[in-house]
């Protein structure tokens, strides 16, 4: 039976029930709904709506229901209830009779679902924080393993300057740390309890909402009932934090897909995160990384979906807000498995050092060093930039690297070039000169890894 049937004389259509019911989605809030109901039983007992004995009986029945459903989750969907709140209330009434009908006194499904959803976000958010920390640890471990593996750094997907693989790993550590900061910050703002806000104007019973918030492990109660039941910022922020983090995961996946390609060959991926072709027996495809990249779009879509749903809703609650959960659940599921998969990919990744080094030695990645050398001899940088550009054109025409020019040939570009130019053009010199905070010099990479390990 619907919780709102008294107002209606006619039956709802089967199509409307199918359209209106949210149980196939919000069943995932079952545990939170029971926990919130237990706290609410204590709250209404505190203001004399039910006796201490009745409160104890309600809480016992709710805890029994929690155990039963954990043992057989299928009973929720088999119930045919309108939503998770209806399921819990009906199951409670089946256990304790008319006493179960007292539990909803002073409470609306509006503040109930707002509370359930915040509890769910807090629980899932804590698990996501742990996953981000695991991925961060894997990146740091990989950076330490491969801190001195040389590879080309890219701009515009063209070889630019040599860097180390450790430096590349640490770049993504920075991104993951920002993801952690964003998520924990969002969870702080979501750490307020809407329960007791009623449908929109506040409950009519003079209960202590601070105690209610503490009972549910919230930092504090919400302060405005209209906002409390209509606020979905926590959903938007969690989807937003996920979207930015997925962008980072997608960028990392794209880098690794390229590094793993036959055209680059800088890394090898473990068999456990790759798959083959049904036709081409030689293929070893980076499917885990491609799926991370692909799932990013659906996370973005859910963020846009909740923003669009909320953008024109008047205060307070509207049925549109029932659409907040499906996208949120998909976002959290997608983000969680992508974080787990990214960590697994990194744990089995091996750098093919000879290939990566050879690529770093090609493409005139030491051209900037030649320009800096000319600057050290007194030439203005803009002029040095032009001179080296001319030298690169000549080297390309001769199909040789810059360091293959003879001293006489070098002096046709600038007569200030001496024999000491050659040590400046080695890969080792290119790296060593970037010995500045945040640079790719081995000393800096080692220091950065050490600093990250103590955080």
From Swiss-Prot:
UniProt record, GO biological process: arginine biosynthetic process via ornithine; L-arginine biosynthetic process
Subcellular location: Cytoplasm
Keyword Amino-acid biosynthesis attached: yes
Gene3D superfamilies assigned to the protein according to its UniProt record, in alphabetical order: Fumarase/aspartase (C-terminal domain), Fumarase/aspartase (Central domain), Fumarase/aspartase (N-terminal domain)
Record keyword Amino-acid biosynthesis present: yes
Transmembrane feature ranges: none
Pfam families (UniProt xref): ASL_C2 (PF14698), Lyase_1 (PF00206)
Cellular component per GO, a single term: cytosol
Xref: PROSITE patterns: FUMARATE_LYASES
Principal location listed in the UniProt entry: cytoplasm
Keyword tags: Amino-acid biosynthesis, Arginine biosynthesis, Cytoplasm, Lyase
Annotated pathway: Amino-acid biosynthesis; L-arginine biosynthesis; L-arginine from L-ornithine and carbamoyl phosphate: step 3/3
E.C. code: 4.3.2.1
Protein name stated in the entry: Argininosuccinate lyase
Source lineage: Bacteria, Pseudomonadati, Pseudomonadota, Gammaproteobacteria, Alteromonadales
Gene it is expressed from: argH
């Amino acid at each position: 039976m619907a919780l709102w049937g008294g107002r209606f004389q006619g039956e709802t259509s089967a199509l409307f029930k199918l359209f209106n019911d949210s149980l196939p989605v919000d069943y995932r809030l079952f545990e939170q709904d029971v926990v919130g109901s237990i706290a609410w039983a204590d709250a209404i007992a505190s203001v004399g709506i039910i006796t201490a004995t009745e409160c104890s009986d309600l809480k016992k029945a709710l805890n029994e229901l929690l155990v039963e459903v954990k043992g057989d989750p299928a009973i929720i969907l088999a119930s045919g209830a309108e939503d998770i709140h209806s399921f819990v209330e009906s199951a409670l009434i089946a256990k304790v009779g008319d006493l179960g009908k007292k539990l909803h006194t002073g409470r609306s499904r509006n503040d109930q679902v707002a509370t359930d959803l915040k509890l769910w976000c807090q629980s899932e958010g804590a698990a996501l924080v742990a996953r981000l920390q695991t991925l961060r640890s894997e990146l740091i471990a990989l950076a330490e393993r491969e801190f001195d593996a040389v590879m080309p750094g890219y701009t515009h997907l063209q070889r630019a300057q040599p860097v180390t693989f450790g430096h590349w790993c640490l770049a993504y550590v920075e991104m993951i740390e920002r993801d952690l900061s964003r998520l924990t910050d969002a969870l702080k703002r979501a750490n307020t309890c809407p329960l007791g806000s009623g449908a929109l104007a506040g409950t009519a019973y003079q209960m202590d909402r601070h105690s209610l918030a503490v009972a549910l492990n919230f930092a504090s109660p919400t302060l405005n009932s209209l906002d409390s039941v209509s606020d979905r910022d926590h959903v938007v922020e969690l989807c937003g934090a996920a979207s930015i983090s997925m962008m980072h995961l997608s960028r990392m996946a794209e880098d690794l897909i390229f590094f793993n390609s036959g055209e680059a060959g800088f890394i090898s991926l473990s068999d456990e995160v790759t798959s083959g072709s049904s036709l081409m027996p030689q293929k070893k495809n980076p499917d885990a990384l491609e799926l991370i990249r692909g799932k990013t779009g659906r996370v973005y879509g859910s963020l846009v979906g909740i923003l669009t749903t909320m953008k024109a809703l008047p205060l307070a609650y509207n049925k549109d807000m029932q659409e907040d959960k499906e996208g949120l659940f998909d976002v959290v599921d997608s983000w969680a498995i992508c974080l787990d998969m990214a960590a697994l990919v990194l744990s089995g990744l091996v750098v093919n050092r000879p290939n990566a080094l050879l690529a770093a030695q090609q493409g005139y990645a030491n051209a900037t060093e030649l320009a800096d050398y000319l600057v050290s001899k007194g030439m203005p940088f803009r002029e040095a930039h032009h001179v080296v550009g001319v030298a690169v054109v000549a080297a390309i025409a001769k199909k040789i690297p810059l360091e293959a020019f003879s001293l006489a040939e070098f002096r046709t570009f600038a007569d200030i070039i001496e024999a000491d130019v050659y040590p400046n053009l080695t890969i080792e010199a290119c790296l060593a000169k970037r010995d500045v905070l945040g640079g790719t010099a081995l000393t800096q990479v080692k220091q950065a890894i050490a600093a990250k390990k103590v955080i």
